[in-house]
Each structure stands twice: as structure tokens, then as C-alpha cells.
Amino acid sequence: MSRDELGAWLRLILTPGIGPVSAYELLRVFGHVKALFEASPAALRLVVSPRQTESLLQAPPLWDGLLSRTLAWLDAATPQQHRAVITLGDPLYPSAFLNLDDPPLLIHALGAPAAFAALQNPKTLAVVGSRNPTPAGLDNAFAFSQHLAEKGVLIVSGLARGIDGAAHRGALQGSHSQGAPVGTAATLAFVGTGLDQVYPQAHRELAQRIAQQGLLISEYPLGTPPLASNFPKRNRLISAFSQGVLVVEAGLPSGSLVTARLSMEQGKEVFAIPGSIHSPASRGCHALIKQGAKLVEKAQDILDELPHLLPVLPLLQVASPASGSLSEAPPPFSETSTEKFSEPFTDGLKPTDPDQAVLAALGYEVVDLDTLQARCGWATPALQAALMRLELSDQIAPLGGGFFQRRGLA
């Protein structure tokens, strides 16, 4: 893509009053994005309103700055990590998006060169859920994603706190397992900001790892902040790109339920992991199961329902964006990731005091002492002291054999 063509695409997405429907009609009539900006006012008025015509004739005030910023973002390329601005009609543009009523005019992509083939990979599963999960929810998201990635399934999520982060981590772990397909993308993250930003900041190292072994994707221009309105739009791309969606844990309401609803409307399979009837974090999954989502207890349940997810074709012989074509990328972040696959994580868990931390780690399950210790990361004396306080205050019940459960769950 030339500089002029990139500039025309960026100008189109910045033009006030030109939404997806108008933009697609303009492209259909004029055939090329540069041609519509070279058209006469009279020709434009045959396609769009006079006010929209006036907008198209005036360069948006932020356009020059965005073009320079995007060119700089693209020009700092290395062979290890590529960047690309992929527009509607480009061979790399995900064909799955064409089924949307409002496919993005362009996407930004950043990641490992071989991973760009994943943009046309039909063997994908979205794993989504709460930003404030229980410990069991985090464990399930990680374990399901790890197992599926080991089998070659491409895990898709949104880089959010909680379940999303655990799903990406599990996929990264699974892609390193013995027997996992070689040369495949580990995971794809669809984000709700420009790709020159990371949200949440706590996932900066995770984003680094995804950029090294998978792809980060955004339809938003560089510099776009994490606006609340961006994330429901992002969810439509997750559902469109995936063959099915697994909701690990979700309350009511939840953005992950939006993704599940979109998937149902698109005829995709929706899976949900059940939880305790006492847990608010499980109510969204239970609602989905009532509406026809498939209850799953293990990752193999998903593979049994979607056998076509296996095997994933290797991505070793794939052409990635070439240097000098506005499509190669350097590492997006300067520091080197030091996150270890084996480290415990508590993404989204923020208890307010020690006893509440133990209750959060206990969740709504029957949990043994070793698991509690691993989740809390405490020395045994401190954990046992907290358990004693909770038992004396009638908040938990010892079940014998080193197992504990919250009280009031009868």
C-alpha cells in the first residue's frame, strides 16, 4: 500500500458523518478509496448527502498527524515482528468480517510474521468472561485454553482483565507444550484501543508475549484511548472471527454475554461452564445454558462438538507483509517480558484484607488447603490463622481432610 493510499483510508475513517454504510457505498460506486476523494462535489452528492459531501471535501483536522504517526509506527520494522494496516479488499483481510453488517474498513495488526496467516484461520475459539473472576474462573480459563492450544486450536480473546488474560496465558502455555503444532499462532487479542497503547497497563508484558507469538488486532486508529464505547464494538469482531465462544464465568450483566449473543445470532456454537448457584459470577453462564448454550465440563467437550477445529494447518509457509509495503513491525514495547508461564496469577482479584483474600480464593467451591495456599501465595501459618478466624466467625466450614467451603451454601 502506498503512502497516498494509506492516507486516503485514514482520511475516510476520520471524516465526520461518514459511517460504515456510507463508506461502503462510496467505495462500491467509485471503486477505490483514492478515487472518491478525487471525485467532484456533484458526483459525491449522487451517493451521499450534501452535508456528507461537504465533509468529504475537507480534510479532517487530525488527518495529517494520524498519517505521520501511522507511517512512523509502520516504518520501525524488524523481521521478528511485523505491523500492518490491512484494508477491506486486502488478501490478508479476515474473510469472516465480511459477514458483519458493519465490517471494519481497516484493521491494524501487530505480531509474529507467521501468525499473520491466522487472519484466515477458520479453526478458532473465543474464550471470554468476567473482568472480576473467581479463582476457579481464572483456573478454568487457563486450563481450557491451554488444552485447546495444545491441540492446535487458536484461542481468541480481548486482552481484558480477568478471564481474557487467563485465556491468553493458557494459550501461550499450551502452544509451548510438547506435541503442540509447530509454527502456529498461539493466540489473537482484539483490543479496544489503538495498537500503540496497552489497556489495561497491567497486561503490558502479556501484550508483549502475544506480539511475539500471536497477533494483536485493532480497528481503531493509533492514539485511540480505551473508551467504554469501543469494547462492545470490539466484541463483534471477536464473535465474527471465531467458530464458537466459550464463556468461562460471567455475571449479570456482562460484556461477555454480548459476545455470546452475537455468536448465537451468527449461528456459532456457544459454550458455558456452570458454577455454583450461589455465585453471582456464574449467573451469566447459567442464563446462557437456559438459552441453549452447551454446558461444558472439560475442554474435550468443545472438541467433541466442533471436531473441525482439529487439526490446525501449520503456518510455516505463509507470506507475511513485506518490508517497505507499510506492513512490517518492530517490538511494540521496549522492555523484555520476564513473565514466567509457571507463575500463579490473580488477574482481577483484589481483596481488601487478608480474610477477604482467603474468601476470594475459596470462591464457592470445596477447596483443599494446598490449593488455597497456591492461590493466596501465603506461608502456612498466615493462611491457617486466617482460616481459623473465618471458621470462628462462621464464614467457612471445615469439611475434614483439609477441605473447606463457605457457609450458607445449602
Set out the residue ranges of the language-model regions.
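Short, small/acidic-rich helices and loops at N termini and domain boundaries
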Residues: 1-92, 369, 393-395, 400-402, ...
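Glycine-biased, small-residue-rich flexible motifs in mid-sequence functional cores and linkers
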Residues: 1-5, 87-410
